[in-house]
Amino acid sequence: MPTAGAPPITDAFGAIAHPVRRTLVTELAGGDKAVSQLAAACTVSRPAVSQHLAVLRGVGLVSEQRHGRERRYHLHPERLDEVRKWMHTLDRFWGDRLDRLGRHLEENP
């Protein structure tokens, strides 16, 4: 259940729809990183990485902390819980449907 004030699940889906943002989320899953470290893992410029991070920040997937002149980013994976729950529901739905189809095809060759 989303918490009060949390961006809706569609925002999280939109944020992770872009391949660069998925790369950033994957990189941050390994721990906090600076923009320069994240840019090295991507095929886009540092300013583009910063723009993608702003989208992720906007939906609460990442937060930013300044350490001197460096900005470090932290992943908040709990924001993906609603996405994971929704995908699990679909997985169960389609799993059940495909199981029934398989049984039907075995019984009616």
Where in this protein do the model-derived segments appear?
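N-terminal helix-turn-helix DNA-binding core of bacterial DNA-binding proteins
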Residues: 2, 7-47, 70-81, 85
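Intrinsically disordered, low-complexity proline-rich regions
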Residues: 35, 59-60, 109
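Alpha-helical residues within the helix-turn-helix
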Residues: 40, 51, 57-58
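Beta-hairpin "wing" of winged helix-turn-helix
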Residues: 57-74
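C-terminal structural segments of small proteins and small subunits
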Residues: 80-104
